[in-house]
Amino acid sequence: GKVNPSGKLPMSFPKHVGQQMVNYNRKLSSLWAGYVEGDNQPLWEFGYGLSYTTFAYDALTIDKTSVCVDDVLKVSVDVANTGDRAGEEVVQLYIHDLYSVVTRPIKELRDFRRVALAPGERKRVEFTLPVERLGALDENMRFTVEAGDYEIMAGSSSADRNLLKTTITVKK
């Protein structure tokens, strides 16, 4: 290949025709979410992509561990091209409200950045995340940012094995 692919899937892709869609942003539930036969993992998860090179993620950092609703959070992560070809990677930033009044998805994509890296090159990818982007509709259908703990995740796809994680606290 003269061209190194760098696209990412906009959906989770099932393993077989009979498997229901497995969404990256499914709601947390105590009910059984699997199947009688087979597992409930997709063949390829949301954000998955192919490349002729490999990338490694490291050093997820945030500038504050405690924030107010009107603050802006700066998130950064190091990405390295560990392969022998130049390539582009799409770094994905997810959030999760750990203790929400309403049921929210396990992961919510909040931002992404495309970064080009030469073989062996390492770059720090930075995100500016207004705290208000952590919000959602409450039980009265009003947009609100709840006080409490939120998980910030960065990686190459929505799969847990690919995500670096840290936690912040939102204060009212």
What would you call each of these model-derived segments?
Residues 1-88, 94-96, 147, 151-155, ...:
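Secreted, periplasmic, or luminal enzymes acting at the cell surface/secretory milieu
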Residues 56, 61, 78, 111-118, ...:
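Generic structural detector for well-ordered beta-strands
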Residues 72, 94, 108-110, 142-144, ...:
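Short intrinsically disordered coil segments
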Residues 72-74, 122-126, 163-165:
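Intrinsic-disorder/low-complexity, polar/charged segments enriched in Ser/Thr/Lys/Arg/Asp/Glu/Gln
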Residues 86-93, 105, 138-139:
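Short, hydrophobic/aromatic beta-strand segments
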Residues 101-137, 141:
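Intrinsically disordered, low-complexity Pro/Gly/Ser/Thr-rich segments with frequent PxxP/GP/PP motifs
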Residues 130-172:
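Terminal connector regions
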